[in-house]
């Protein structure tokens, strides 16, 4: 037995200088752990609700109410429970909140407690978190989907697509993939300088130049890959997070690159991109409630590119089930704070995998030094992780943790590589 004995919480700052919640858990055997909660810039309407204070303090973004919720309601609800009974702990959290969207106590309060309990239980068991959650067979290191050029809500530029990523699919190990990604990142900086473009950074560590549009951004990254001597499409592939909900309006459709477009016109644009560039994955290409558009797009290009539901699914098993039934998307983005407990996150991943959907573990734009998602990526065998550029310590912390996990696994470690993208078949 590893009984939860004490639960504490505090307000800390995330990578954007905004407050977030950190929760600490002490077990009766002396095991101790903490977890910090991330926060998004572009958030889906269907996400679980963060509890913020409002008012003048921290421009309304304080989380003292969420901290108080942990101390006054969550702690009494879970103290005395065996920390290794994660599903029981998380059900106690859900019962304490009592709302479908976690709006009373806040998903940020619930998630902090849920993850801290899991980390404490792993500590008590003498296991690394990835092994504790994933069991004896957890051994696959994910492909890092490195956001090296930022636009949309992550940068103050005119680029509508939110993230342009490189995926080192041809590397033999995670260690090699990280090196390749870092080399492309630095090569991109050189390319931008040569062309007189800005090299300031966006929220997630990627460069944020004000370029003309999607194709120019992809061309710049292609040049950067070439500079390193790596082969585009074989060693390194490309990926996008469009975050289309951010530029969709009822009545006018998608205001994208200077014109209003329909879902069909957006689909035609993506089909053109997939034929012209080695793109393995497109996230949120359409609005979070445009089910018909998603289904049509999946029918059109889902056989040759990964279509990832982020705002569409918000890591919610019920939303994902709806997508599976309708045939919308073919992959799930996994963000623990979208749903608010570890158990619900694992349930969503399990549902995705059982139905042939790929999964990509993901950070948020507002991150901390917490490395939980690195362990979870290996634990669930997602084969893909999105946690920003190979720069800024809150991003690099996750990559460095994956290096440690790969080293820990030794000869048992396997890098997912191109196998993570079975639909990818770029012909150039």
Swiss-Prot record:
Chief location category: cytoplasm
Any one GO MF annotation of this record: magnesium ion binding
Catalytic reaction annotation: (2R)-2-phosphoglycerate = phosphoenolpyruvate + H2O
SUPFAM superfamilies for the chain: Enolase C-terminal domain-like, Enolase N-terminal domain-like
Binding annotation for Mg(2+): 241, 283, 310
Annotated metabolic or biological route of this protein: Carbohydrate degradation; glycolysis; pyruvate from D-glyceraldehyde 3-phosphate: step 4/5
Top-tier EC class: lyase
Protein's UniProt name: Enolase
Species of the source: Rhodococcus opacus (strain B4)
Gene (name only): eno
């Amino acid at each position: 037995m590893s009984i939860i004995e004490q639960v504490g919480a505090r307000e800390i700052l995330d990578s954007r200088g905004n407050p977030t919640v950190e929760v600490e858990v002490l077990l009766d055997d002396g095991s101790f752990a903490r977890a910090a909660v991330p926060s998004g810039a572009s958030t889906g309407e269907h996400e679980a609700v963060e509890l913020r204070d409002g008012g003048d303090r921290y421009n309304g973004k304080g989380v003292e109410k969420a901290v108080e919720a942990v101390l006054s309601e969550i702690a009494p609800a879970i103290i005395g429970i065996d920390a290794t009974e994660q599903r029981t702990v998380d059900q106690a959290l859900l019962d304490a909140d009592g709302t479908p969207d976690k709006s009373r106590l806040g998903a940020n309060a619930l998630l902090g407690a849920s993850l801290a309990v899991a980390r404490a239980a792993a500590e008590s068991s003498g296991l690394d978190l990835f092994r504790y959650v994933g069991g004896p067979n957890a051994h696959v290191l994910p492909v890092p989907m490195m956001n090296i050029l930022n636009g949309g809500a992550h940068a103050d530029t005119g680029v509508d697509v939110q993230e342009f990523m490189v995926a080192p699919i041809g590397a033999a190990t995670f260690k090699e993939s990280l090196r390749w990604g870092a080399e492309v990142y630095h090569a991109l900086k050189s390319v931008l300088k040569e062309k007189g473009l800005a090299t300031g950074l966006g929220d997630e560590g990627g460069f944020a130049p004000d370029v003309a549009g999607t194709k120019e951004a992809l061309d710049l990254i292609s040049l950067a890959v070439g500079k390193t001597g790596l082969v585009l499409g074989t060693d390194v592939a490309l990926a996008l997070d469009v975050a289309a909900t951010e530029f969709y309006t009822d009545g006018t459709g998608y205001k994208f690159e200077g014109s209003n477009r329909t879902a069909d016109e957006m689909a035609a644009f993506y089909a053109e991109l997939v034929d012209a560039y080695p793109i393995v994955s497109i996230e949120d290409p359409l609005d979070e409630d445009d089910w018909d558009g998603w289904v049509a797009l999946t029918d059109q290009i889902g056989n040759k590119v990964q279509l990832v539901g982020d705002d569409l699914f918000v890591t919610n098993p019920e939303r994902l089930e709806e997508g599976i039934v309708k045939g919308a998307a073919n992959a799930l983005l996994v963000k623990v704070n979208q749903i608010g407990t570890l158990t619900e996150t694992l349930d969503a991943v399990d549902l995705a995998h059982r139905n042939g959907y790929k999964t990509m573990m993901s950070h948020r734009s507002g991150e901390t030094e917490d490395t939980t998602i690195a362990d979870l990526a290996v634990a669930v065998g997602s084969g893909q992780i999105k946690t920003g550029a190979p720069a800024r310590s809150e991003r690099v912390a996750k990559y460095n943790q994956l290096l440690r996990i790969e080293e820990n696994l030794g000869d048992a470690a396997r890098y997912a590589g191109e196998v993570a993208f079975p639909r990818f078949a770029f012909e150039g």
